Amino acid sequence: MGSMAYLTFMTGGGALTAVVVQYLRHQPLSDIYRLPVRVIVAGFFGVALYTVMLAVAFGLAPSTDIGQINLLNYLWPVWMVVLGIIFLGNRPKVILVITGILMGLFGVLISRGFGLLTHPPLNILPPALATIGGFLWALYIVLLRKWKIPEEKGGTAFHFAVCAIIAGLTAVYLKEWQSIPPWSGPMIFWIVVGAVGPVGIAFSWYEISVKNGPVFLIASLSYFIPIGSSLLIGLFFKETMNKGLIFGAILITFGAWLVRSASQEKIGNTP
């Protein structure tokens, strides 16, 4: 199954899962689509377009570069800190923040291997898409916090429904619907896992937490995701596994600790 066809099913199922989450939390279902215009616009770029860009980046990148594309995407906690300073008025200790950010960037650079300068990527489009997409996602999250959007006005279902439409139309353009393999148990399993877990439930809960919790702490904790995801990618894409991949993920995590140490935001703060 092509990447856009799979993304259509995954994000469409994720949107339906987010509706179920809204219902189980006893929140009005009408709030799913009655969103402020600015949230709809920001979510188009920060959720729908970001997800499509990341999928395209993974699809275009050679297997040896998958790990680096993944870590470039996970620079969004860095962008959250920078954008938090700009839009939220946070004033962390600048030297520690810069040190943490540089460690994260260096971690990404070496994640492809220690021969980056002698063997640069042949195609810069995948890393560019992953980097820009991660920035758009971070901007969306910070703007939600700045605008103090009510918790019940969750845009996850709406934005992923839009994403499913974009992915579906892209799959039409790429003629992926004409080459879908016969349905099988493993295919259905991965669609359901992707839709219910990382898209439907995880995004819904993350959006709720970032509206109410300390954005610097959330950004810092998010840094621990790269280690787990890098291990999984190394498991499924053995060509991308190298000493630099795990070391780079560890550097990003340590950079997160520095950024968190630099933050002057208290854990109990709410908007």
Question: What is each residue range found by the language model?
Answer:
Residues 19, 43-48, 52, 77-82, ...:
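Hydrophobic/small/kink-forming positions within alpha-helical transmembrane segments
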Residues 9-10, 42, 72-75, 99, ...:
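Hydrophobic core positions of alpha-helical segments in small-molecule transporters
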Residues 5-16, 54-91, 215-235:
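Specific alpha-helical transmembrane segments that line the substrate/conduction pathway
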Residues 263-271:
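Intrinsic disorder in cytosolic terminal tails and internal cytosolic loops
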Residues 1, 29, 58-62, 111-123, ...:
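Membrane-interface helix termini and inter-helical loops of multi-pass transporters
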Residues 26-67, 110, 195-213:
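Specific transmembrane alpha-helical segments of multi-pass solute transporters/efflux pumps
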Residues 18, 92-115, 223, 232, ...:
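Hydrophobic transmembrane alpha-helices of multi-pass small-molecule transport proteins
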Residues 3-23, 37-41, 96-106, 125-132, ...:
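Hydrophobic alpha-helical transmembrane segments of multi-pass integral membrane proteins
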